[in-house]
Amino acid sequence: MEEAGQDPLDDVRDVMEIPKLEITKQNLDSLNSDLEKDLQRMDEANQVLLKKIQEKEETIQSLERDITLSVRQAREREELDHRTAEKEAALRDLELETAKLEKNKEILSRSVVEVQKEISRKFKNVSLDKEALKQMLAELKVKLQKSTESCASQEKELVKIESDYQSVYQLCEDQAHYIKKYQEILRQMEKEKEMLLLEKEVQRWRSSIQSAKTRPGADCGSDHELLIAKFRLKLKKVGKTTRPFRCKAQNNATQIVKPGSTLVETIQSNMEKTIVKKQKRIFWYRHFRYFIFVVMIFFRLLGYVLFYLQYINPDLLVDALPMVMSRETLTRLRDALFPFLTLEVEEVLPH
């Protein structure tokens, strides 16, 4: 009788649960259809992103080529800068030489005038030989010709150096233009890196969605909602990272750090480091030189003292120690140096 009373109740419960199960089944079917639609949309978006990736890879290759070319050009510019520095030093030397030659020319002109005056005086006072005067004039003319030729050659060299300076100035302007291009390339590279990170995240979430789709139908809806929520949060985080980096100052102000300006900062820091290293080397070289000089002087004085004690006044220590030290200190010194003393020196010290 008890079994007969329980069977109708179980049937009623089963009948009540059937519509609930149908409702859950309908919900699951709708969720699965939504998932399929989302996956189709993701596939289309991924195809578009793949096309963009291919285009960006091509642009990256072209940018790498441009970077290699810019590096080569930078090396060539460094060599040109070195050459220009050498030429500038040569220019300075030439300017100094030209100044000296001009002074010599003035001195020669003055001396020629003085010689002419002296010749005129001597010609008035004493009848000089015409041949001697002709020789003097010929020598002076030869000297003047040599000085004029040297001045002309120096002027030609100055013209050449000025043309080289103009070419170097143009190269420096080109170098600044290429540096600006390099900064723009770096900015584009950073943007492309950010896009690649976004694409990787999309592929990762796509694989996670596919793995969630293969699970049993009972937990599919909750997993789908969790994945969508996580994906939205991740997109928000990545969107924040794509914005320009902002650094908070002490006065709570924001300073935008541009990625292209890092190149100039690195160049300046490298130049400062090299200058500091050179200064340190010069500092240690000078002190090492002073140290060697002091050591040489010390050994020289020590040699003089030993020579004096050996050949001039060997009894200096014997006469000076009793005057400087007391008897107790002399006995202590004798005890300390006893193993190293000979019989002659031992007899000199007090007992």
From Swiss-Prot:
It is found in: Membrane. It holds the Pfam family TMCO5. It comes from the Eukaryota. Residues 17-214 form a coiled coil. GO terms for cellular component: membrane. The keyword Ribosomal protein does not apply. Keywords: Coiled coil, Membrane, Transmembrane, Transmembrane helix. It is a single-pass membrane protein. The keyword Iron-sulfur does not apply. The chain crosses the membrane at residues 292-312. Belongs to the TMCO5 family. This is Transmembrane and coiled-coil domain-containing protein 5B. It comes from Bos taurus.
